[in-house]
Amino acid sequence: MAPKTGETVVEKMEVDEAKQDVPATEPAKDLNAIAVENIKEQLAALDKGEEHLITRVLQVLPKTRKQINDNVLYKLVSSHLSSDAQFAEGMLKYLHYTPAADTEVQPMDTSNVKTKSPKKGVKPVFASPESDCYLRLLVLLHLYAQKKNTEALALGENQLTSIYNFDRRTLDGLAAKTLYFLCVIYEREGRLFDHQGFLNSRLRTATLRNFSESQAVLICWLLRCYLINRQYQSAAHLVSKVAFPDNASNNDLARYMYYQGRIKALQLDYNSAAGYFLQAQRKAPQEGAIGFKQAVQKWVVVIGLLQGEIPDRSVFRQPIYRKCLAHYLDLSRGVRDGDVARFNHNLEQFKTQFEADDTLTLIVRLRQNVIKTAIKQISLAYSRIYIKDIAKKLYITNETETEYIVAKAIADGAIDAVITSDVRDGPRYMQSSETADIYRTSEPQAHFDTRIRYCLELHNQAVKALRYPPKKKIAVETIEQAREREQQELEFAKELADEDDDDF
């Protein structure tokens, strides 16, 4: 029917309705299955027996530790084809894990299937000793995390016996990791001192077989054992007799520098100790290792105070040091101000903390520095003061001892004064000389010389740490190549001569 005039017809336009994208729900990832696949890839890399692949696997070991559990280890051990027939049984007894019923593999119905005879001459491919030892190491780390120390020690000792029986250079990294965690468990059990002979024998074996990573780990743990048991002479003797491996990791090198710094500090060689602690801080990881950095910084503060240097306030304000260095901040204030009363109060109040940090021996020696600073301030404040008044300010009951201390400060050049009395057998007093301009002395020159030497040493270390491109190999021609080159030159000369003749 035709539309009437005057009426408008509105036609609906066909518009494609916008399709709503419904996000597809991703299936939940099985973290255990992912971990099993990742570790199987690592085991396949270890089976190749190449050192750089083994190093790469051990570098990601901290990440792998977070992925392992009873389920993952059970699947790995059950599917691992080791040359040792009792490997799986020996590992599973440490796990104490029973798989769930739904995860067990159901047997196939093979009643109507004809069995095929295996091919003749085909031998099964067994896993390498590297992958066996790596699986043992993962089980050891799992037991260590669960604090099953007895089982972990038994497994670790079996692991070391197996490694040293194979005598392979590629097992050095795995042996070093095993030794490290064994020593950690020994220390946790309080039995580290009882295993000094064991560590020494392992160090001899590692040195004879050139196991550099094992050497580095054993040297560090022997030094730690000696220092914990206060066998400082034995620690110094060990450092003088062994050669630390050049290709050791930065973590082991940082520990070695830290222990050397402690030995030098207890030998009162503060300059060398400060240098070792500085290198330990540089070699420490940029992220993590907070406990190690805190331990090093405590010794740095004490060594600086013994050298007459007051630590910068910004050090104590850093988040990782704010809490652990609170006692050392109060100690530094007492040393800076020469406040003997405050120093004695801090020493008595935080004595337990200083003993735990093994810094109490050096902090007690700081008392002489505090007294010397106090005497300096007294000599600047008083042109003349009686010895008995100095004894009151220094909280010393004996005037004779106070006079000896003042005389020692005068002899060391700490103050410019004399001890005298107005009459014979009268009260003795300290007469200070007029303060001289320090810039007229050689002390600023000595300070500038120390700073310049430090900057030059830092520059030299930076230059040594640079990496340069390898030199291009200059090709050395053989006798035949030289003869061919000479023959070509003669022919070329003849051609040039012929061309010249043609031109004429």
Curated annotation (Swiss-Prot):
<dbReference type="Pfam" id="PF01399">
    <property type="entry name" value="PCI"/>
</dbReference>
<comment type="function">
    <text>Acts as a regulatory subunit of the 26 proteasome which is involved in the ATP-dependent degradation of ubiquitinated proteins.</text>
</comment>
<protein>
    <recommendedName>
        <fullName>26S proteasome non-ATPase regulatory subunit 3</fullName>
    </recommendedName>
</protein>
<feature type="domain" description="PCI">
    <location>
        <begin position="254"/>
        <end position="433"/>
    </location>
</feature>
<keyword id="KW-0647">Proteasome</keyword>
<dbReference type="GO" id="GO:0030234">
    <property type="term" value="F:enzyme regulator activity"/>
</dbReference>
<comment type="subunit">
    <text>The 26S proteasome is composed of a core protease, known as the 20S proteasome, capped at one or both ends by the 19S regulatory complex (RC). The RC is composed of at least 18 different subunits in two subcomplexes, the base and the lid, which form the portions proximal and distal to the 20S proteolytic core, respectively.</text>
</comment>
<dbReference type="GO" id="GO:0008541">
    <property type="term" value="C:proteasome regulatory particle, lid subcomplex"/>
</dbReference>
<dbReference type="InterPro" id="IPR050756">
    <property type="entry name" value="CSN3"/>
</dbReference>
<dbReference type="InterPro" id="IPR013586">
    <property type="entry name" value="26S_Psome_reg_C"/>
</dbReference>
<dbReference type="Pfam" id="PF08375">
    <property type="entry name" value="Rpn3_C"/>
</dbReference>
<dbReference type="InterPro" id="IPR036390">
    <property type="entry name" value="WH_DNA-bd_sf"/>
</dbReference>
<dbReference type="GO" id="GO:0042176">
    <property type="term" value="P:regulation of protein catabolic process"/>
</dbReference>
<dbReference type="GO" id="GO:0010623">
    <property type="term" value="P:programmed cell death involved in cell development"/>
</dbReference>
<comment type="similarity">
    <text>Belongs to the proteasome subunit S3 family.</text>
</comment>
<dbReference type="InterPro" id="IPR000717">
    <property type="entry name" value="PCI_dom"/>
</dbReference>
<dbReference type="GO" id="GO:0006511">
    <property type="term" value="P:ubiquitin-dependent protein catabolic process"/>
</dbReference>
